[in-house]
Amino acid sequence: MTQIDYTRAAKYFLLQDFWVGMKLGLKYFFSPKATINYPHEKGPLSPRFRGEHALRRYPNGEERCIACKLCEAICPAQAITIDAEPREDGSRRTTRYDIDMTKCIYCGFCQEACPVDAIVEGPNFEFATETREELFYDKEKLLSNGDRWEAEIARNLELDAPYR
């Protein structure tokens, strides 16, 4: 005669697995959602986030770049091109500052190499384009990015200062 396993039979007839599954489903149904609705909601960004490039200015409006070309030299993708001319006061300023964003690998070496924090990778990550030519940034485009994002860039650099 076969032995009846009463605990197994009780589980089967009382639908224990079904109720455990229902409890788990209801737990997750009423818990807060982990997913955000992206275009309408945005998650937090780290102060170290590396997004769209920008050239910064001093508070008096003068561009920060001193044409030392360290960013051009350190760029592993060779995406940065700089031409410079000396000024009457002996300092140098750029006449051409181009970044080919199709080559850029967003490593942040240009930002680390810059002695005056002129070139930074800003907080903007939504810069999709329709044509390839729009991804070739010239000096004017980089300066306008810097003007647009200056407040957030300055805040992020201040938050990151203890770690630099």
Swiss-Prot record:
Domain 4Fe-4S ferredoxin-type: 55-85, 95-124
Gene3D superfamilies in the record: 3.30.70.3270
Membrane topology category: Peripheral membrane protein
InterPro entries (UniProt xref): 4Fe4S_Fe-S-bd, 4Fe4S_Fe_S_CS, NADH_quinone_OxRdtase_chainI
Residues making up the signal peptide according to the UniProt record: none
Transmembrane segments annotated in the record for this chain: none
Recorded GO CC terms: plasma membrane
UniProt: [4Fe-4S] cluster 1 binding residues: 65, 68, 71, 114
SUPFAM superfamilies: 4Fe-4S ferredoxins (SSF54862)
Required cofactor(s): [4Fe-4S] cluster
Main location: membrane
Domain of life: Bacteria
Pfam families for the chain: Fer4_7
Cofactor note: Binds 2 [4Fe-4S] clusters per subunit.
PANTHER family (alphabetical): NADH DEHYDROGENASE [UBIQUINONE] IRON-SULFUR PROTEIN 8, MITOCHONDRIAL, NADH DEHYDROGENASE UBIQUINONE IRON-SULFUR PROTEIN 8, MITOCHONDRIAL
Protein name: NADH-quinone oxidoreductase subunit I
Organism from which the protein derives: Ruegeria pomeroyi (strain ATCC 700808 / DSM 15171 / DSS-3)
